C-alpha cells in the first residue's frame, strides 16, 4: 500500500469504532480519518475529534448546533452534519474513499446503501444492511462497482478461506465451479451454553451481556446470548456469498479460535484461526489484499487445550431457527425478524421482559404481521415501511408482557 486511504467511520463511538480507530491511529502512513459519526456518546465523539481532527462529523440532528459550539470551543474547525441525511452525505462524499459501516441496527441502512450506490469501498459491520435489504444492497454494489468487505469475524474468515477468484468477484462466479460445498459459521454459544432453558429464563441483563470470549456492545451481546446474532449472520452470509441457507451450517465452537470454515467438494475444510479480537478482521479488510499489523495478540497454539464443536440446540436457541425460517420465507420476513428483535432486545435491556421472551416475541411477529412480498427491485422506502410496521406491532407485543 502506498496511497493514503481517507476513511469515514460511521458508528465511531461503538466497539467496532474503537477497534477500527486503534488500527488507524497506529497506521497514519496508510490512513487518514476523514469523517466520524456518533449518536449517544457525544463526549466520546468530541474526544475522538480532538484526537483525529476529521474534516466532517455526523451527530443527531438535535445535537448539531451544540456539538458545533463544543468543537469551536475546543479550537477545532470541523463541519458538523446531522441525522440520516448527514450520514448519507458523509458516505457519498467525493473525498471519502472507504466507509466503515459500524452503526448498530437498522439506523445504519440508509448510509450503507448510499455508500454502495456511490461506488465506495465499504467495510461492513452493520449486518442489518444485508438482513433488511440483502438483494438491494448486493445489486447496488454490482451496478455501481462498489467493493464490499465483511468485518464480522465469521464472514471475514469465510472470505479469507474462499478461492481468490471468488474474493475478487463473488457476484459473478458460481461456487460449484470452484468446489465450494458448504460454509460453516462458528458460534461461541454465548454465556448460557452450559445452562438450561429454565436458567436462561431467570437471566439478568448483567449476565446476558457478559460474553465469555468477545468484548462487544450490549445489543450484540444479548443477540449472542439468544443466538440471534448467529441467525442474522446466517442471513447475511446468504447474501454476501450468494448461497441458499441450506448450504450454510452453524456449529458452536466455545473457544472462538476457529472463526469460520469453508467445506470443499474434495473433502477439504479451510478454516481461519486467530485470537478472539475484532482488530484482526478489521485490519484484514482495511488493508485487503495486503496485510498490516492489527495490534492484536497472536494466537498461542501451544496454550490451546482442545477445540470443541457442538450442534446448536434449536429449542433452547429458537432465534437461530427463526432466522433460517425467515430467510426461507423472503426479505419481508427477515426485515420483520430484525425489527422485532431490536425492539425485544431493547425491552429486555430495560428490564421489561425476560431474555427468553425475545424468541417468543420474534416468532409472534413473524407469524402475525402481514405485509406484501418484496421484489429484488424494492426501494428503501418499501423496506423501511415494513421495518416501521414491525416495530410498531412489536411494541404492542412487548406491552402485553411488560
Curated annotation (Swiss-Prot):
Enzyme class: oxidoreductase
Keywords: Isoprene biosynthesis, Manganese, Metal-binding, NADP, Oxidoreductase
Enzyme Commission number(s) from the entry: 1.1.1.267
Gene Ontology MF, one: 1-deoxy-D-xylulose-5-phosphate reductoisomerase activity
Entry annotated with the keyword DNA-binding: no
CC cofactor: Mg(2+); Mn(2+)
Swiss-Prot/TrEMBL GO biological process terms: isopentenyl diphosphate biosynthetic process, methylerythritol 4-phosphate pathway involved in terpenoid biosynthetic process
Highest taxon above the source species: Bacteria
Positions with a binding annotation for Mn(2+): 152, 154, 233
UniProt: 1-deoxy-D-xylulose 5-phosphate binding residues: 127, 153-154, 188, 211, 224, 229-230, 233
Pathway involvement of the protein, from the record: Isoprenoid biosynthesis; isopentenyl diphosphate biosynthesis via DXP pathway; isopentenyl diphosphate from 1-deoxy-D-xylulose 5-phosphate: step 1/6
Keyword Translocase: no
Pfam name, any one: DXP_redisom_C
Cystine crosslinks: none
Reactions catalysed, as given in the entry: 2-C-methyl-D-erythritol 4-phosphate + NADP(+) = 1-deoxy-D-xylulose 5-phosphate + NADPH + H(+)
Residues annotated for NADPH binding in this entry: 13-16, 126, 128, 217
Record HAMAP family: DXP_reductoisom (MF_00183)
Family of this protein: Belongs to the DXR family.
Function: Catalyzes the NADPH-dependent rearrangement and reduction of 1-deoxy-D-xylulose-5-phosphate (DXP) to 2-C-methyl-D-erythritol 4-phosphate (MEP).
Protein name in UniProt: 1-deoxy-D-xylulose 5-phosphate reductoisomerase
Organism: Psychrobacter arcticus (strain DSM 17307 / VKM B-2377 / 273-4)
Designated gene of the protein: dxr
Amino acid at each position: 500500500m502506498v496511497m493514503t486511504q481517507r476513511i469515514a467511520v460511521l458508528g465511531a463511538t461503538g466497539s467496532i469504532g474503537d477497534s477500527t480507530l486503534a488500527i488507524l491511529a497506529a497506521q497514519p502512513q496508510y490512513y487518514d480519518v476523514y469523517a466520524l459519526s456518533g449518536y449517544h456518546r457525544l463526549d466520546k465523539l468530541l474526544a475522538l475529534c480532538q484526537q483525529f481532527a476529521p474534516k466532517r462529523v455526523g451527530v443527531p440532528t438535535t445535537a448539531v448546533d451544540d456539538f458545533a459550539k463544543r468543537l469551536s470551543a475546543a479550537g477545532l474547525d470541523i463541519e458538523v452534519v446531522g441525522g440520516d441525511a448527514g450520514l448519507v452525505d458523509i458516505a457519498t462524499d467525493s473525498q471519502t474513499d472507504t466507509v466503515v459501516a459500524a452503526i448498530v441496527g437498522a439506523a445504519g441502512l440508509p448510509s450503507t446503501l448510499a455508500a454502495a450506490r456511490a461506488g465506495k469501498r465499504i467495510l461492513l459491520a452493520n449486518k442489518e444492511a444485508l438482513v433488511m435489504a440483502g438483494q438491494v444492497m448486493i445489486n447496488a454494489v454490482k451496478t455501481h462497482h462498489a467493493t464490499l468487505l465483511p468485518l464480522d469475524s465469521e464472514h471475514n474468515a469465510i472470505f479469507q478461506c474462499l478461492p481468490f477468484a471468488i474474493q475478487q468477484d463473488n457476484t459473478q462466479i458460481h461456487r460449484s465451479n470452484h468446489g465450494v460445498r458448504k460454509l460453516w459459521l462458528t458460534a461461541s454459544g454465548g454465556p448460557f451454553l452450559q445452562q438450561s432453558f429454565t436458567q436462561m429464563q431467570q437471566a439478568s441483563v448483567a449476565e446476558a451481556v457478559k460474553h465469555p470470549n468477545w468484548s462487544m456492545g450490549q445489543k450484540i451481546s444479548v443477540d449472542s446470548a439468544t443466538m440471534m446474532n448467529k441467525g442474522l449472520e446466517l442471513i447475511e452470509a446468504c447474501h454476501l456469498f450468494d448461497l441458499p441457507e441450506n448450504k450454510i451450517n452453524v456449529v458452536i465452537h466455545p473457544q472462538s479460535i476457529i472463526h469460520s470454515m469453508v467445506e470443499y467438494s474434495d473433502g477439504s475444510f479451510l478454516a481461519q484461526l486467530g485470537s478472539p479480537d475484532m482488530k484482526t478482521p478489521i485490519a484484514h479488510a482495511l488493508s485487503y489484499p495486503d496485510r498490516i499489523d492489527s495490534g492484536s495478540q497472536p494466537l498461542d497454539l501451544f496454550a490451546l487445550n482442545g477445540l470443541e464443536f457442538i450442534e446448536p440446540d434449536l429449542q433452547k436457541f429458537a432465534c437461530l431457527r427463526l432466522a433460517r425460517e425467515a430467510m426461507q420465507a423472503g426479505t419481508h420476513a427477515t426485515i420483520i425478524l430484525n425489527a422485532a428483535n431490536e425492539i425485544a432486545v431493547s425491552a429486555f435491556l430495560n428490564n421489561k421482559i425476560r431474555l427468553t421472551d425475545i424468541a417468543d416475541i420474534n416468532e409472534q411477529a413473524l407469524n402475525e404481521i402481514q405485509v406484501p412480498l418484496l421484489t429484488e427491485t424494492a426501494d428503501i422506502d418499501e423496506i423501511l415501511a415494513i421495518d416501521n410496521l414491525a416495530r410498531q406491532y412489536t411494541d404492542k407485543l412487548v406491552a402485553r408482557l411488560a
